[in-house]
């Protein structure tokens, strides 16, 4: 469905003078040839630049001409790209929680949206049919049957870890994993964790089996916490009963006239004999005290 063209003064989104123009294909002079991010489409007069793959995988954007497998250049209308930018400004990324997430899971009922690089971080599946020019993305949960998030087999993964050990880099790898876990823990604590954070921890704890013994030990922590809460609850009940008893005692004192509401409590707090002793100090003692100053 076509998106409403926004108003305002933003040079990227306003004006229809260039609505029939197409984006120009540029290649980054510093990126390796064939790199995912090396191809950029640019339209100078509208001040728009976008990675080719970000355009290809954006859910609300299609090329403005028929796909030609023999022609590597793509055809993106500036007007369509502006609409997609505006659409993305209203969509939050399921991975980083920032707006501008135009890449959605291809399953229509799935609410997940991503920036393309965030989708890769979240181990989403990219599907390309170059003959028909279709580019699809699926989140981990809705990946097509039989297709794993990574196509590297287990033997290669194990070999990678052994090579890290031999190269003296295994400690650094685990330190980075630890930093990642600390970062996720921080987002959980300040209530900014994304859905992908919850999904990742769920997979880590329940699907891989690596932390099975951790969950068994965690059961003891749950029991200990429950006992601690129950003990605090009993203490609070005892305190409430004590406070209620004190309140009842005060009411009884008032009814018996022990507490006189009209009595003054502004007098000296010293015992009567001590107060009298201070009042009867001789003038010589008082004078001596004055001389010492």
UniProtKB/Swiss-Prot annotation:
Top-rank lineage group of the source organism: Eukaryota
Any one GO molecular-function label of the UniProt entry: zinc ion binding
Renumbered residue ranges of the record's region Disordered: 263-293
Zinc finger region(s), PHD-type: 91-143
Annotated localization: Nucleus
Cysteine pairings via disulfide bonds: none
Name of a matching Pfam family: zf-HC5HC2H
Organism: Rattus norvegicus (Rat)
Protein's gene: Phf11l
UniProt-listed PANTHER family: PHD FINGER PROTEIN, PHD FINGER PROTEIN 11
Keyword annotations of the record: Metal-binding, Nucleus, Zinc, Zinc-finger
Lineage, top ranks: Eukaryota, Metazoa, Chordata, Craniata, Vertebrata
GO CC term (a single one): nucleus
Gene3D superfamilies recorded: Zinc/RING finger domain, C3HC4 (zinc finger) (3.30.40.10)
Zinc finger extent (C2HC pre-PHD-type): 25-61
Protein name in UniProt: PHD finger protein 11-like
């Amino acid at each position: 469905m076509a998106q409403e063209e926004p108003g305002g003064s933003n040079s990227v989104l306003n004006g229809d003078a260039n609505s029939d123009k197409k984006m120009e294909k540029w290649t980054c002079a510093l990126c390796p040839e064939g790199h995912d991010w090396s191809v950029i489409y640019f339209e100078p007069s509208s001040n728009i630049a976008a990675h080719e793959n970000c355009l290809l995988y954006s859910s609300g954007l299609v090329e403005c001409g028929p796909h030609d497998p023999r022609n590597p250049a793509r055809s993106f209308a500036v007007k369509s790209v502006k609409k997609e930018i505006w659409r993305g400004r209203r969509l939050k990324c399921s991975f980083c929680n920032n707006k501008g997430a135009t890449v959605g899971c291809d399953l229509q009922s799935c609410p997940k949206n991503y920036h393309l690089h965030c989708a890769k971080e979240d181990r989403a599946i990219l599907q390309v049919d170059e003959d028909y020019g279709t580019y699809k993305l699926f989140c981990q949960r809705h990946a097509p049957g039989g297709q794993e998030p990574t196509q590297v087999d287990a033997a290669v993964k194990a070999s990678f870890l052994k090579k890290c050990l031999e190269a003296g880099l295994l400690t650094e790898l685990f330190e980075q994993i630890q930093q990642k876990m600390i970062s996720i823990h921080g987002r959980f604590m300040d209530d900014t964790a994304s859905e992908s954070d919850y999904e990742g921890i769920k997979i880590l704890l329940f699907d891989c089996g690596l932390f099975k013994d951790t969950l068994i030990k965690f059961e003891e922590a749950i029991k200990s916490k429950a006992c601690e809460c129950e003990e605090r609850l009993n203490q609070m009940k005892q305190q409430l009963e004590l406070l209620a008893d004190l309140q009842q005692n005060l009411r009884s004192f008032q009814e018996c006239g022990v507490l006189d509401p009209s009595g003054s409590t502004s007098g000296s707090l010293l015992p009567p004999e001590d107060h009298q002793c201070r009042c009867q100090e001789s003038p010589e003692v008082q004078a001596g005290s004055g001389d010492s100053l």
